[in-house]
Amino acid sequence: MRIRSVLIAAITVIPFSLAAQNISMRPPITGIAKVSVYATDMNKSKQFYGTFLGFPQIASASASAPMEYRVSSKQSIEVQPAPNGTTDYLAYIAFATTDLDSMQRYLTSQKVPVEGDIQTQPDGTRFLWVKDPEGHRLQFVQLPPHGHLLPVSSSSVKNAPQPISQIILHAGFIVHNRAEEDRFFHDILGFVEGWQGGRGHKLEWVDMRVPDGTNWLEYMLQDPKAKNEGDSGELNHFALGVPDIHQAAQMLQHRHWDSSQPYEDPEIGLDGKWQLNLYDPNGTRAELMEFGPVRKPCCYPYTLPVPK
């Protein structure tokens, strides 16, 4: 009789345990799927992202839709009209997951507010919205099995220059409270620190790698009391990977980008990697970066293997 009672209790507990496990497990977060920026002049931004950087434009579902440029089959840059009065031109960052439904359940179980329901784009991409503790807008997206299915526009393909890059390595934004951001990105989402550094004795940058890929989010640490509106385009940024920074710079010099921002020469950053800072028409930094360091980083060693 006792054995029977134990078996019944075990059978009863198992479904509840499995249900709880399904709710609490985080699905994989594999990388950056999209970076979205605001623009005050869509035509100028089209010249920058399409003609200068060479990214083909994805065919829009409607004339009012934001412009989207394909970096690879799984990554893109979106440009949308800037809201009136905005001083921050980084609209949002989208992270890819393999199971959006499980991600929604997981976020809810962790008491992370999910904005609305899961939505689906014409190409089959599914997405949901959240905000981090400092109010940065984030998307989690589940791409179709073969990446973006929407074709690039025919006008974009014709006489298109060679894309400057085929990968978004990282994106970064201003962070005032690292502890709060770590509770969200590290404790809940599983991001892992790969490197940190800064000028002098001041910690300024922290690279937080996605848990199931090689892309990373860069905390641009700032004093909570400081006003950074004038520097937001420099701090809120994204980086494109290139195998050879000097070849990339030479390619861009032949394209004669007419920008109000000064052209910067390639330099080795404090992380030991060659980089080149470019700026779109609204001052958002589009950083070109080589994949690996050519010298020892300034301040702290890499704590994770450097992605190749």
List each model region and its residues:
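Positively charged n-region of N-terminal signal peptides that target proteins for export
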Residues: M1-S5
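Bacterial N-terminal signal peptides
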Residues: V6-S17
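Vicinal oxygen chelate
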Residues: Q21-P27, T30-T40, M67-R70, A82-I167, F173, W195-R199, ...
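Core segments of cupin and vicinal oxygen chelate
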Residues: P27-S76, G172-L217, W274
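Intrinsic, low-complexity N-terminal interaction/targeting segments
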Residues: Q75-I77, P83, Q119, N215-Y219, ...
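Structured core of small recognition/catalytic domains
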Residues: A179-D182, H186-I268
